[in-house]
């Protein structure tokens, strides 16, 4: 977060940070000076803050490394994982479930589109796959409501959907093994 967050991240990441907005997220990577991937992530904006979603096993090392380059930038790099919860939903009836939960009609089939409601951010990957982002305070009520219409299957299923969608996930074991252009980020 901070007033220099976007320019700072633009100089550090492989993606065009200027393309993210309150309505659009994107995938990117954080690389070594030689261009090898240290992390792959999902990046989006909420209010004036940029959020980077990456594997928990890389969080501390990426946060520490980015902090080294802050210098005089008006940027704060913090771990928000105790504040926000992500829930993935997938299936043929996701659009109907979205409408039931939010009371809104899904108006965009553009991938990586974000819709914000009072309590939930909805990241639309496709008509059949979404991620809900909510506060830890709101998560139990949202989970209860979702459970009335959907069956919890766990992170393994979500990881499989990521693989099937061609979304690269860099883990500690695969750091520096890939270049972003080989992984479409």
Q: PLM features: residue spans?
A:
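Basic, glycine/lysine-rich polyanion-binding surfaces/domains
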Residues: 1-184
């Amino acid at each position: 977060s901070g007033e220099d967050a976007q320019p700072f991240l633009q100089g550090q990441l492989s993606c065009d940070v200027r393309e993210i907005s309150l309505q659009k997220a994107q995938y990117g990577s954080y690389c070594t000076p030689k261009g090898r991937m240290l992390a792959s992530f999902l990046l989006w904006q909420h209010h004036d803050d940029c959020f980077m979603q990456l594997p928990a096993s890389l969080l501390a090392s990426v946060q520490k490394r980015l902090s080294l380059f802050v210098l005089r930038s008006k940027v704060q790099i913090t771990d928000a994982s105790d504040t926000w919860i992500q829930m993935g939903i997938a299936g043929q009836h996701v659009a109907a479930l979205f409408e039931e939960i939010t009371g809104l009609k899904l108006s965009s089939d553009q991938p990586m589109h974000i819709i914000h409601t009072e309590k939930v951010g909805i990241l639309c990957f496709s008509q059949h796959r979404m991620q809900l982002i909510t506060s830890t305070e709101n998560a139990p009520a949202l989970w209860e409501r979702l459970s009335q219409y959907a069956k919890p299957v766990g992170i393994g299923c979500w990881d499989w959907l990521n693989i099937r969608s061609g979304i690269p996930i860099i883990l500690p074991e695969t750091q520096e093994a890939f270049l972003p252009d080989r992984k479409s980020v």
